[in-house]
């Protein structure tokens, strides 16, 4: 059976066509908050149940509970605060209990009932969510630029923000129907922000050997400089699945959600989100959602063990490498040969090779995937554009 939604019910804050027109009219008369691309994505994810059981942006009780306990105030596991930050001037005259319009690209995309307005300590947030206040950490840097106040309350979606990859996007309601239609009872979800190399493929196929289906769900949205562009990731996975997977065993769908680079906390968050899509298992790799050397390579595994009530089974798959003696991708549990035979796949080294127009060897990356990356004149996000929203 597909997994039960987190909290037991799949949230739906979308509205009927008739009500949508009424809300659109109301929005014209309401105070407006302009959203970044990341916040607009959060609105859509709340409305479509990706963030179930959340019905809106967090109130202070839940916010503090998540920061301190990694649980909502009702004790349900939740590790990343879902918050809406505003400047005092933006909500001048707005009182608790008022409705506001949430605007993206000049259009109202949702209405929100402001149930609470409260302050927050950005440094405390960084220390607890990222386990560091180092401004070199991309999540910390982004957090410190956020606004002074938080507002919490339920939202009603008027329309989804524009999605360039609409043809590749499925919402939880849709994936659940699709998984059931395929007769899948066990589904392994794979989170990624990268173009696939053979280490990823090894892990995915290992999971697929003992589940009914694989759900590949890459993040599109804000990422740090040096990460792959969204379109490169999508095209690369299309090539990999077409040439190297039984297509009836894989569902591919993009998820518009910002990377936070919060390591172990974000790994739990990624698992909860995929549980809402219907996945029963979640692949947890080496240094999941990590960046630099801020987190231990298997620190996320330890955190998962603190959440026996998560409701989705983590799959801990060790780092894969190519063994010249074995002649294939293996991991340290199944390869008896010494380090001299082992070729470890470095994401940094792969990026450098691709950036220089070199083709990585076929034991590192499939040629069809290399073709996709090299056809793009600039497959990686550059410094300034990472902060443009």
Swiss-Prot record:
<keyword id="KW-0547">Nucleotide-binding</keyword>
<dbReference type="InterPro" id="IPR014729">
    <property type="entry name" value="Rossmann-like_a/b/a_fold"/>
</dbReference>
<dbReference type="InterPro" id="IPR025980">
    <property type="entry name" value="ATP-Sase_PUA-like_dom"/>
</dbReference>
<keyword id="KW-0808">Transferase</keyword>
<dbReference type="Pfam" id="PF01747">
    <property type="entry name" value="ATP-sulfurylase"/>
</dbReference>
<keyword id="KW-0548">Nucleotidyltransferase</keyword>
<dbReference type="GO" id="GO:0070814">
    <property type="term" value="P:hydrogen sulfide biosynthetic process"/>
</dbReference>
<comment type="pathway">
    <text>Sulfur metabolism; hydrogen sulfide biosynthesis; sulfite from sulfate: step 1/3.</text>
</comment>
<dbReference type="InterPro" id="IPR015947">
    <property type="entry name" value="PUA-like_sf"/>
</dbReference>
<dbReference type="InterPro" id="IPR002650">
    <property type="entry name" value="Sulphate_adenylyltransferase"/>
</dbReference>
<dbReference type="Pfam" id="PF14306">
    <property type="entry name" value="PUA_2"/>
</dbReference>
<comment type="similarity">
    <text>Belongs to the sulfate adenylyltransferase family.</text>
</comment>
<dbReference type="InterPro" id="IPR024951">
    <property type="entry name" value="Sulfurylase_cat_dom"/>
</dbReference>
<dbReference type="GO" id="GO:0004781">
    <property type="term" value="F:sulfate adenylyltransferase (ATP) activity"/>
</dbReference>
<protein>
    <recommendedName>
        <fullName>Sulfate adenylyltransferase</fullName>
        <ecNumber>2.7.7.4</ecNumber>
    </recommendedName>
</protein>
<dbReference type="GO" id="GO:0005524">
    <property type="term" value="F:ATP binding"/>
</dbReference>
<keyword id="KW-0067">ATP-binding</keyword>
<dbReference type="GO" id="GO:0000103">
    <property type="term" value="P:sulfate assimilation"/>
</dbReference>
<dbReference type="InterPro" id="IPR020792">
    <property type="entry name" value="SO4_adenylyltransferase_pro"/>
</dbReference>
